[in-house]
Amino acid sequence: MPCLYICGECGAEHEIKPKEPVKCKDCTHRIMYKKRTDKMIQFEAR
């Protein structure tokens, strides 16, 4: 299942699949940030 990541250098969005190197396809920068979900997530407290 691919996830959306945002490049720390140029800000481009890329899908990174499992076993694929974690780097930007535009500028080859290696720091990528995972995009946050728009859905509301609720956790159960115990």
From Swiss-Prot:
Entry annotated with the keyword Translocase: no
GO molecular function: DNA binding; DNA-directed RNA polymerase activity; zinc ion binding
Quaternary structure annotation from Swiss-Prot or TrEMBL: Component of the RNA polymerase I (Pol I), RNA polymerase II (Pol II) and RNA polymerase III (Pol III) complexes consisting of at least 13, 12 and 17 subunits, respectively.
SUPFAM superfamilies linked to this entry: RNA polymerase subunits
One Gene Ontology term from the biological process aspect of the record: transcription by RNA polymerase II
Chief site of localization: nucleus
Similarity annotation: Belongs to the archaeal Rpo12/eukaryotic RPC10 RNA polymerase subunit family.
Keywords per UniProt: DNA-directed RNA polymerase, Metal-binding, Nucleus, Transcription, Zinc, Zinc-finger
PANTHER family reported for this sequence: DNA-DIRECTED RNA POLYMERASES I, II, AND III, GEO11084P1
Keyword Transcription among UniProt keywords: yes
Annotated protein name in UniProt: DNA-directed RNA polymerases I, II, and III subunit rpabc4
